[in-house]
Amino acid sequence: MQWFIQDVNIGKNLRSLRERHGYSQYKLVIKLHLMGSSMSRSTYSKIETGTRNIRISDFLALKQIYGVDFSEFFVGLLPEKNTFV
């Protein structure tokens, strides 16, 4: 169950990044296609809702499209630096 929650949260972060950059799902998928991805809009939608996992190649393409650090995808999912004793 914990993994599902993280998938949903990653999906929320992906949606936030997409909206922040002003893309519809359709326009984002077109950009992904230009980078060699075969992802459909419905597949991307499932990734945003946490019902499907993202392929590493698509993840890397999104990083390049958005021009962000990997940590942007994991906001709220990674433990704080000083939480371990």
Predicted regions and their residues:
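Short, charged recognition helix plus adjacent turn
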Residues: 2-4, 19-20, 64, 71-85
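Short basic helix-loop element that most often maps to the first helix and adjoining turn
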Residues: 12-33
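Conserved hydrophobic/aromatic packing and binding residues within compact polymer-binding modules
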Residues: 14, 28-29, 44-47, 73
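Residue-level detection of the helix-turn-helix DNA-binding "recognition helix"
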Residues: 19, 33-34, 49, 78
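Short coil turns linking two alpha-helices in DNA-binding domains
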Residues: 24, 35, 40-43, 55, ...
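Short, basic-rich loop-to-helix N-cap that marks the start of a DNA-contacting helix
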Residues: 49-61
